[in-house]
C-alpha cells in the first residue's frame, strides 16, 4: 500500500479529473500536489502556502484548471494548477471556512464554522449569495446537478437544500433536527437517495421522492463517527456503483459498504489509531486516497480490492456448489430435524447486529444455514457402544475388559 509522506496533518485531498495528480491541504497551510504512477510511485509537483493558517478544504473545477482552497484564514484562494498563480478573496467569511465545492464553471460554494453558506462567481471579488439557515459549522456539500440544488450538512443536526438558480437566496427545504451532528453526505441510487454520515456512527438514508423532512432509514454498524463518504467509480467491474460507497471513520478504517441491500464488503485501508478525515478516488487504477492524522496520503488500489473480493466470493460459491453436490449424491431426500429449525430460528432473531463485522458474519451464515435445511443429509444410525469394550486413546484397536465379565 503506497504512502506519500507530507510532513503535516492532512485535512483534505482531491484528485485531478483527467491527470494522475493528487492535491492535499495541510494543517500548516501548505497545499501540496503529487503526481503518481500506476504502481503507486509518486513525486512532488509543487508546494504552495497561500496562508500560514490551516487549509481545511479543497475543490477542483470541472477540467482541473482551478483549485479552490479554504481554511482558518477566512479567505478563498483560487490556484491555477498549471502556473500555480494564486488569486485570493480575503475576508471571504467572518470566521474560519470549513468546506468548499465547485458546482458549475462559474459557481463555487463555501461554508464556515458559524453555518453561513456563500456562493461565489470566481470572476467577481464579492460573493453573490449568502445563506444563514444553519447555526453551527458546515461539514459537507452535495451537488444535485439535475435540479441545480446544493445540499449542505451541518453540526446543528440538520441538512438544507438551496436552489442556486433563484435570484434571491432561497432554501428549498431543511430537515428536522436529527439529534446528531451530520458530518458527511453522498448520493446513491442514481441520486434518488441521499446517504448521510453522523457523529454516532449511523448512516441516515434520505429519499428525495419522500421529501427532506426526515430520513427514511438508519443503518447502524460503524463503532465511531462517519467523518467522510465517497462514491466509487462507475466502471469498476463486478460492482454496483449506484449503491456501493466508501466510508471513513474515526476508528481509522476505510470501509466498502453496499447500501440497500446493506452489506459490509471489506476494509480498504487502515490508518491504525488515527481517524480518517477525508477520502477521494482518482483515475488510472482507481487509487483511493485517504488521509488522517498520520501525516501521510495513503493510496489504495480499489480495482485490485474488488477483483480479489470477487475472486474470493467465486471460490466460496464453487465450494458451496461442490459440497452440495456431494451431499446429494446418495439420492436421499433431506429431512429437517429440530436442531436445524432451532438454528434457523436463532439466526433469524439475531439479525440486528451492532457492528459491520457481525452483520457480515450473519449474511455469510444465512446461505449456509439455508443449504443445511434444504439438503440435510439423513444421519446414519449410531450403534450404541458395548459396555464390555473400551478403546484406548490414540488407537483404533479394541481391548476386552475382563473385569466386566467377572462381575456378571
From Swiss-Prot:
Chief subcellular location: nucleus
Biased composition (Basic and acidic residues): 396-408
PANTHER family, A to Z: WD REPEAT-CONTAINING PROTEIN 55
Repeat (WD) residue spans along the chain: 5-44, 50-86, 87-130, 133-172, 177-216, 221-267
Skewed-composition ranges (Acidic residues): 313-339, 356-366
One Pfam entry name: WDR55
The species this protein was found in: Coprinopsis cinerea (strain Okayama-7 / 130 / ATCC MYA-4618 / FGSC 9003) (Inky cap fungus)
UniProt-annotated stretches for the region Disordered: 311-408
Gene3D superfamilies per the UniProt record, alphabetical: YVTN repeat-like/Quinoprotein amine dehydrogenase
Keyword terms, alphabetized: Nucleus, Repeat, WD repeat
Protein name: WD repeat-containing protein JIP5
Similarity annotation: Belongs to the WD repeat WDR55 family.
Gene Ontology CC entries for this record: nucleolus
Gene name for this UniProt entry: JIP5
Amino acid at each position: 500500500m503506497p504512502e506519500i509522506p507530507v510532513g503535516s496533518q492532512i485535512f483534505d485531498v482531491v484528485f485531478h479529473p483527467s491527470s494522475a495528480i493528487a492535491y492535499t491541504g495541510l494543517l500548516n497551510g501548505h497545499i501540496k500536489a503529487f503526481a503518481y504512477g500506476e504502481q503507486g510511485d509518486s513525486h512532488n509537483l509543487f508546494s504552495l502556502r497561500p496562508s500560514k493558517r490551516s487549509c481545511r478544504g479543497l475543490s477542483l473545477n470541472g477540467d482541473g484548471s482551478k483549485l479552490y482552497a479554504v481554511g482558518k484564514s477566512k479567505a478563498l484562494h483560487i490556484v491555477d494548477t498549471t502556473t500555480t498563480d494564486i488569486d485570493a478573496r480575503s475576508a471571504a467569511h467572518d470566521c474560519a471556512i470549513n468546506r468548499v465545492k465547485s458546482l458549475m464553471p462559474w459557481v463555487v460554494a463555501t461554508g464556515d464554522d458559524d453555518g453561513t453558506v456563500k456562493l461565489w462567481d470566481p470572476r467577481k471579488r464579492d460573493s453573490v449569495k449568502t445563506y444563514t439557515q444553519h447555526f453551527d459549522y458546515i461539514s459537507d456539500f452535495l451537488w444535485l446537478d439535475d435540479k441545480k440544488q446544493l445540499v449542505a450538512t451541518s453540526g446543528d443536526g440538520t441538512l438544507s437544500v438551496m436552489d442556486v438558480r433563484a435570484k434571491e437566496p432561497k432554501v428549498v427545504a431543511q430537515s428536522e433536527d436529527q439529534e446528531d451532528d451530520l458530518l458527511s453526505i453522498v448520493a446513491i441510487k442514481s441520486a434518488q437517495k441521499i446517504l448521510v454520515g453522523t457523529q454516532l456512527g449511523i448512516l441516515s438514508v434520505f429519499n428525495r421522492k419522500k421529501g427532506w423532512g426526515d430520513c427514511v432509514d438508519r443503518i447502524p454498524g460503524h463503532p465511531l463517527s462517519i467523518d467522510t463518504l465517497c462514491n466509487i467509480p462507475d466502471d469498476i467491474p463486478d460492482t454496483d456503483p449506484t449503491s456501493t460507497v466508501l466510508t471513513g471513520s474515526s476508528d481509522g478504517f476505510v470501509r466498502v459498504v453496499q447500501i440497500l441491500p446493506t452489506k459490509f464488503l471489506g476494509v480498504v485501508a487502515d490508518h491504525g489509531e488515527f481517524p480518517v478525515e477525508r477520502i477521494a478516488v482518482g483515475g488510472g487504477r482507481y487509487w483511493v486516497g485517504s488521509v488522517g492524522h498520520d501525516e501521510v496520503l495513503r493510496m489504495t488500489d480499489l480495482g485490485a480490492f474488488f477483483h480479489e473480493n470477487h475472486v474470493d466470493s467465486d471460490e466460496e460459491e464453487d465450494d458451496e456448489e461442490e459440497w452440495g453436490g456431494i451431499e446429494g449424491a446418495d439420492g436421499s431426500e433431506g429431512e429437517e430435524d429440530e436442531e436445524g429449525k432451532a438454528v434457523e430460528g436463532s439466526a433469524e432473531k439475531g439479525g440486528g447486529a451492532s457492528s459491520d463485522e457481525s452483520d457480515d458474519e450473519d449474511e455469510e451464515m444465512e446461505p449456509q444455514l439455508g443449504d443445511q435445511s434444504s439438503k440435510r443429509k439423513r444421519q446414519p444410525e449410531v450403534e450404541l457402544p458395548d459396555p464390555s469394550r473400551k478403546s484406548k486413546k490414540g488407537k483404533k484397536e479394541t481391548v476386552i475388559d475382563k473385569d466386566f465379565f467377572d462381575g456378571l
